[in-house]
Design a protein with these regions (language model features):
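Anionic coordination/interaction segments
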Residues: 1-362
Length: 362
């Protein structure tokens, strides 16, 4: 069975079915911030070290496989679906995943509502951008909801999977407008936090996993999404998550684009707080400045264009032109790309090498 094809002109592999034999992943990032993303939006993110500075949680032996990632739920009427198919696994009218050089784009549709999601790590920035464009291809106005969702790792990926008697009491977040700040251990011993934000006013949010999923719930049908109503939960211990609720209305032919940012923010020790440390007001200056860099579709697309230019230049120094198309493709695109990913990761993180053993990257 064929699951996709190579698009040499765009340096992409195009996956045409979400039901691949195993998750087919791409690596986002070229310097310090990295994300792994599968063809169904599974994966995780980390800053420099996949063991000690992991932003989002991933369960390697989960059932079903690859069922934790960076997700967007679209709820229209009684239908709930995801641009990458997982985790709702609703049959889609159209689906494509384009794994490119440092970015992945998902194009899918359901009931004349089209979604295009592009995930990438901008050059020189410690963040992942998710640009989500929604288009109404019907002849009637569409009213629906979008729910974002990530599950935060408590930084140390090994400890996160083992030290439960402690972990269940340490998770901590705060919310300001459309920005969610994961600040576990920031007060005690860290000078960094994670940011998850969107460039639009939200109609609700959630930061507590059990509140979002519901009692005995699961991420294929979260209680918040099914009910179409966020709970505005604030995590205190247990499992912190990030979820934004956006109510969207599209006229026939209309499109809207939202830019989500997942970032690692580090403050100098002497600048951890605004005012007195006892007041507990984290310094959000760097986070707010980063959000402004990607607060429009135009800024996001400019960063994506810069990333593509970066890879085009990197791959331009050695080329082969032969009578064998497959050889040219391997040498000119994918072999070089694989070598750079291996160099950046130091073979430290994948879906099979967890990054927890030595967690070392370059």
């Amino acid at each position: 069975m064929k699951f996709g094809y190579f698009d040499d002109a765009n340096k992409e592999y195009v996956i045409t079915s979400p039901k691949t034999p195993l998750p087919w992943i791409n690596y986002l990032g070229s310097e310090n911030f990295f994300s792994l993303i599968s063809n169904t939006c599974g994966g995780y993110s980390f800053y420099k070290d996949a063991k000690l500075l992991r932003l989002t949680r991933y369960r390697y032996n989960n059932v079903p496989f690859d069922s934790n990632g960076h997700y967007y739920y679209i709820k229209e009427g009684d239908t709930i679906w995801n641009p990458g198919w997982m985790p709702a696994k609703t049959d889609l009218d159209a689906y494509e995943c384009h794994h490119g050089m440092g970015y992945s784009t998902f194009r899918s549709s359901k009931n004349d509502l089209q979604a295009e999601l592009t995930a990438f790590v901008p050059v020189g920035k410690n963040c992942e951008i998710n640009q989500l464009t929604l288009t109404n291809n019907s002849k009637e106005t569409k009213d629906f909801s979008v729910f974002s969702y990530v599950e935060f790792c408590l930084w140390n990926a090994m400890d996160d999977m083992t030290n439960f008697q402690r972990n269940f009491s340490t998770g901590e977040v705060e919310v300001h407008g459309s920005a969610i700040y994961h600040k576990t251990e920031y007060r005690e011993r860290r000078n960094h936090y994670a940011l998850y934000a969107v460039n639009a006013p939200v109609d609700g949010f959630d930061t507590d996993r059990d509140s979002f999923l519901g009692a005995y719930g699961e991420n294929s049908a979260p209680e918040v999404v099914v009910s179409d109503q966020s709970k505005n939960s604030i995590a205190s211990g247990w499992a912190p998550v990030g979820s934004h609720h956006l109510k969207v209305s599209l006229a026939p032919g209309e499109s809207k684009t939202f830019v989500f940012i997942l970032a690692y923010i580090e403050n100098p020790v002497e600048e951890k707080w605004i005012g007195r440390a006892e007041d507990g007001k984290i310094n959000r200056t760097r986070a707010e400045a980063l959000m402004k860099e990607f607060d429009t579709k135009e800024k996001s697309e400019a960063a994506l264009a810069e990333l593509k230019k970066y890879w085009d230049e990197l791959l331009s120094h050695f080329t082969v032109s032969s009578s064998e198309e497959k050889l040219d493709r391997m040498v000119n695109i994918w072999h070089q790309y694989q070598c750079m990913v291996t160099f950046n990761m130091s073979r430290s993180a994948s879906y099979f090498e967890s990054g927890i053993g030595r967690g070392m990257g370059f």
